[in-house]
UniProtKB/Swiss-Prot annotation:
GO terms for cellular component: membrane; phagocytic vesicle membrane. It comes from Drosophila melanogaster (Fruit fly). Residues 1-51 are annotated as: Disordered. Keywords: Cytoplasmic vesicle, Immunity, Innate immunity, Membrane, Transmembrane, Transmembrane helix, Transport. Residues 1-11 have a biased composition (Basic and acidic residues). It comes from the Eukaryota. The chain crosses the membrane at residues 58-78, 128-148, 159-179, 197-217, 230-250, 259-279, 320-340, 363-383, 390-408, 451-471, 484-504. The gene is SLC46. It is a multi-pass membrane protein. InterPro entries: MFS, MFS_trans_sf. GO terms for molecular function: peptidoglycan transmembrane transporter activity; transmembrane transporter activity. Residues 27-38 have a biased composition (Polar residues). This is Probable peptidoglycan muropeptide transporter SLC46. Belongs to the major facilitator superfamily. SLC46 family. Expressed in Malpighian tubules.
Length: 519
């Protein structure tokens, strides 16, 4: 998972029986009653077969976001500590330096000798981190091909529980490795941490929880409420990351990596137990059995169904818009994956930050966009009063915020300028929920799972390229200008802005049809 849980949060599966009418078809009668002829893709319309339209909401339906918050708390509580342990054990076990010397890395006790060792160790540690990212990508990418269909057939809750179990096992194994390193003065190879990723990878990583979570939201919410619920989901991610980052540095200074990893494991297994007891299934059994017959769950039929859904022609400019918005989401995931693989190392080599200083920065960096994200509901409400493109506006503003923040990081010469970059990135949390909402509104309910499954696969595969590329850029510029990768990130966000501009242009050519989608 990335600090962007980013990343990870990307998939919506169908919540409608296959025997029911397609929403765009079922609403033909209401279309004829409108003088404008607007499509029934309108977000405020509910259709037969949608679970949220046919049964009352229970309080358990609102427990999803707290569980996601706990997962992201546990993840970020250990994230920076894990990176630091990889560097420390690369120094001791990888290069054979004494424990007393390696303990000084990443502290304020900087000498010419420790700076030389840091520059020698970092490329090696970057390779270990890259290997971990690659292992985390391969199997989840394969699982993602079928995640939408599995979620449609077996329900959302089993996928959520699988993902939580994977993360819990990762931190349990990491705690065991850190415990051994603690009692051998670091003489445990950092490559053992790659082993901790294997159970997480086999159980789907962030792909499965993203599938299940956003499918769950699509099942239990509809109309304009869906965009608000998407923001609440994104906010839960940011608050979880914030709390994890806030406590991580202090816990690490007071204890050690073994305790930090153990706390993360306990939090996730506790959430898993409560989820099994309290979280209801959002997709009724009757919908699951009728929407995806058992005979259609074979690998071949799933792949055929996925391909036919993703490649079929669509009315107006829907296929172009879907593809373009998906590319924007892929660009943001690409930058997040790549940047996060080297950013902590960049801050250590450029400004000599400690773990505590970095986690304090992370706390502020998460808090500011989280507050802006919580205000996203107010922004949407206000924009809907004065424009018919509120969702598209917010996505564009968010990408501009990303771009300016990356440029500031790239050209920063002092530590305080990194905090200025946080202010420039105040709206960066809004692009994902806004793009997901646009895609959801463009699709009928029985196609969301497959379209977003494809997106999830591509996002899961993106670290194969992004992490490799960013590590290569960072190691090549380590001794000259290590922050140049931030400028590359700004360039990619600029491409995203141009792509959303083309969506705006296409939308303006058919306002009657597309206003309900982007409002």
């Amino acid at each position: 998972m990335n600090e962007e849980p980013h990343a990870h949060e990307n998939l919506v599966a169908k919540a409608q029986r296959s025997g029911d009418a397609d929403p765009e078809v079922a609403s033909t009668a209401s279309e004829k009653q409108r003088s404008s002829g607007a499509s029934a893709i309108a977000v405020g319309t509910e259709f037969p077969g949608n679970p949220q339209a046919s049964r009352p909401q229970s309080l358990g339906m609102y427990l999803l976001e707290p569980f996601i918050l706990i997962l992201l708390f546990a993840y970020n509580f250990s994230s920076t500590v894990l990176k630091n342990e990889v560097i420390y054990q690369s120094c001791t076990a990888g290069f054979g330096y004494p424990d007393s010397v390696c303990q000084l890395l990443g502290t304020k006790n900087i000498t010419n000798e420790t700076k030389r060792i840091e520059e020698q160790v970092q490329p090696y540690a970057a390779q270990v981190t890259l290997a971990m990212r690659l292992v985390e990508c391969f199997i989840p990418a394969f699982c993602g091909l079928f995640a939408g269909s599995w979620a449609d057939h077996y329900g959302r809750k089993p996928l959520l529980m699988c993902s939580f179990l994977g993360y819990g096992l990762q931190y349990l194994i990491s705690a065991a490795i850190a415990y051994c390193a603690m009692y051998t003065q670091g003489l445990v190879s950092p490559w053992w941490y790659v082993l901790s990723i294997v159970p997480l990878s086999c159980l789907g990583s962030s792909v499965t929880y993203s599938v299940a979570a956003v499918c769950f939201i699509a099942d239990v919410s509809g109309g304009k409420v869906r965009s608000y619920r998407m923001i609440a989901y994104e906010l839960a991610i940011y608050v979880g990351l914030l709390l994890g980052s806030l406590g991580s540095g202090y816990a690490y200074e007071a204890t050690d990596a073994y305790i930090v990893f153990s706390i993360s494991a306990v939090c996730i297994f506790t959430a898993l137990f409560l989820m099994a007891l309290l979280l209801p299934e959002s997709l009724p059994a009757r919908n699951r059995t009728l929407s995806t017959p058992t005979t259609d769950t074979s690998v071949v039929s799933m792949l055929k169904s996925l391909w036919s859904t993703c490649s079929k022609p669509r009315e107006h400019q829907n296929r172009f818009m879907l593809t373009t918005i998906m590319v924007v989401l892929l660009l943001t995931a690409f930058v997040s994956d790549g940047s996060n693989s080297v950013f902590y190392k960049f801050m250590r080599i450029k400004f000599h930050w400690t773990v505590k200083q970095f986690t304090e920065y992370e706390t502020v960096g998460i808090l500011v966009p989280a507050v802006a994200g919580s205000g996203g509901v107010l922004f949407i409400w206000s924009l809907r009063k004065c424009t018919n493109s509120a969702i598209l506006w917010l996505a564009l503003v968010s990408l501009l915020s990303h771009c300016s923040s990356s440029l500031m990081k790239g050209f920063a010469l002092e530590s305080w300028q990194i905090y200025v970059a946080i202010g420039l990135g105040v709206f960066k949390s809004l692009v994902n929920p806004m793009c997901r909402t646009m895609i959801t509104n463009l699709l009928p309910a029985d196609e969301r799972g497959k379209i977003f499954a494809l997106l999830g696969v591509l996002q899961a595969l993106s670290p194969l390229i992004s992490s490799t590329l960013y590590v290569a850029i960072y190691t090549r510029t380590l001794n000259t200008e290590p922050g140049i990768f931030n400028v590359f990130s700004a360039f990619l966000f600029g491409i995203g802005i141009i792509l959303l501009g083309t969506v705006w242009h296409k939308k303006s050519r058919n306002l009657v049809y597309y206003e309900p989608v982007f409002k």
